[in-house]
């Protein structure tokens, strides 16, 4: 049972048409389709349709696409959120060796998801749920679909820089970003079974 407005896709705009071409006619069908696609970084994140073109995506591209679908179909109650949470060995076991190697308890990670009223909607992968990150959520803000690229990266890097200073982390922002990239690569490889 869905606890959100499962609207029919009725718009004649680009994203709605791309879903209709795949015989997907409601938001819940679109969300389940997107959730079933593999987790992998897209080739051209600036194209909002990249998930449908590549047949895979990340939390950013998948949720931005669903938000754009909601916009096209005049459903403003669906909000695209960017949260910063503590990514650590308990909520992301695949990165435990990397964090241990660098003697880090956690690293702040930016995550995108949708909110419908007070309900958190998570469509990153088949197994992902809000419980994966909500207990460790540090902050969140609403963003626009086009902000999942440059804006998200800048915001995330600024957050890590502040965290590094406040916690006296013995790495530069560049080193921390590289550690984070290694964690994400490790996670992607585990998710893809590589």
Say what each PLM segment does.
Residues 26, 62-63, 106:
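Residue-level preference for nonpolar/small residues embedded in alpha-helices
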Residues 1-57:
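Secondary-structure boundary elements
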Residues 29, 65-68, 109:
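Short Gly/charged-rich anion-binding patches and loops
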